[in-house]
Amino acid sequence: LASDLQNGKIAVLGVAYKGNTGDDRESPAYEIIAKLKKDNYEISVWDPHVANEEYVDLNKATKDASLVLILCDHNEFKDLDYDLIKENMKKAIIFDTKNIIKDVPEGIELYNYGNLYSLN
């Protein structure tokens, strides 16, 4: 998936080690971010629970991004502003590693890691 990105910007949503907390100590998200940076991707981060002046809001994080990468299961990520995401991205792609998103509107590609929602 990463090799097919249109440009080198990835919007990372969530760096806390656990959903709905502000604790990012020893979070695996930082290892993922470091790997992506090493591979020359530009990274923008939005985490509404972690205080860091470098972290931006959803609008700035997704502006001109090629991928939204959800790494934490904060409640805020369950109902994102999909219109804003579509407006900010040339091709809106979301990769949800926490399986917190069930559906997205038309015009957004959603990839869930191990999605079990379709099983009834």
Tell where the protein language model's regions lie, with residue ranges.
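Structural/interface elements that position substrates and couple domains in central-metabolism enzymes
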Residues: 1-120
